[in-house]
Curated annotation (Swiss-Prot):
InterPro entries: GreA/GreB_C_sf, TF_GreA/GreB_CS, Tscrpt_elong_fac_GreA, Tscrpt_elong_fac_GreA/B, Tscrpt_elong_fac_GreA/B_C, Tscrpt_elong_fac_GreA/B_fam, Tscrpt_elong_fac_GreA/B_N, Tscrpt_elong_fac_GreA/B_N_sf. Necessary for efficient RNA polymerase transcription elongation past template-encoded arresting sites. The arresting sites in DNA have the property of trapping a certain fraction of elongating RNA polymerases that pass through, resulting in locked ternary complexes. Cleavage of the nascent transcript by cleavage factors such as GreA or GreB allows the resumption of elongation from the new 3'terminus. GreA releases sequences of 2 to 3 nucleotides. Pfam families: GreA_GreB (PF01272), GreA_GreB_N (PF03449). This is Transcription elongation factor GreA. It comes from Chlorobium phaeovibrioides (strain DSM 265 / 1930) (Prosthecochloris vibrioformis (strain DSM 265)). Disulfide bonds: none annotated. Keywords: Coiled coil, DNA-binding, Transcription, Transcription regulation. Belongs to the GreA/GreB family. The keyword Manganese does not apply. One of its GO terms (biological process) is regulation of DNA-templated transcription elongation. The keyword Coiled coil applies. GO terms for molecular function: DNA binding; RNA polymerase binding. Residues 44-75 form a coiled coil.
Length: 159
């Protein structure tokens, strides 16, 4: 059995919608491409057929992945998230201890919902792992390819 997946209601619904699209639209389109490529004759040197079969393989793998994640999902309600420490679905404001000016804000989410452009980082990322369990006032050292970054947890909240 796979690991438990923690999702927001929106994240769960997005994955469910993607699964529905794959099952009811993409799968049929791929089967049409395979049938079309087969109609061109010799399959041994048919790049179109090979590409369609590869797309089918990727589609079926994604379907299996989504079904697994959705079946092991726990939907988290932000209203029930504690803010005494950094947990999944909490947002955290960090002060850069090296320059005392820069502040960063991240929201910790599951890998399935991470989006760095929106400040949503995975609890499994190096930054997420460093922050989990920290409380306001705690110092955090985050190891990145360029070296170490030093922050202090200034605020923990739920959006």
């Amino acid at each position: 059995m796979s690991d438990r997946v923690y999702l927001t209601r929106d994240g769960y619904n997005r994955l469910k919608d993607e699964l529905h699209e794959l099952l009811h639209v993409t799968r049929a389109e791929v089967l049409e491409k395979i049938a079309e490529a087969r109609s061109h004759g010799d399959l041994s040197e048919n790049a179109e057929y090979d590409a369609a079969r590869e797309q089918q393989s990727q589609t079926e793998a994604r379907i299996a992945d989504l079904e697994s994640k959705l079946s092991s999902a726990t939907i988290l309600d932000p209203k029930h998230i504690k803010t005494d420490k950094v947990y999944i679905l909490t947002s955290v404001e960090l002060l850069n201890l090296d320059d005392k000016k820069e502040t960063l804000e991240y929201t910790l989410v599951s890998s399935e919902e991470s989006d760095s452009d929106l400040g949503k980082i995975s609890v499994r990322s190096p930054v997420g792992r460093a922050l989990i369990g920290k409380a306001v006032g705690d110092k955090v050292t985050i190891i990145v390819p360029k070296g170490e970054l030093h922050y202090e947890v200034k605020k923990i909240f739920v959006k």
